[in-house]
């Protein structure tokens, strides 16, 4: 998944 701090989409 994406690393925290690099939002690809709005992941809440």
From Swiss-Prot:
Signal peptide: none annotated. One of its GO terms (cellular component) is extracellular space. It comes from the Eukaryota. Hemolymph. Disulfide bonds: none annotated. Belongs to the tyrosinase family. Hemocyanin subfamily. Does not function as a hemocyanin. Hexamer. This is Pseudohemocyanin. It comes from Necora puber (Velvet swimming crab).
């Amino acid at each position: 998944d994406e690393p925290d701090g690099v939002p690809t989409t709005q992941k809440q």
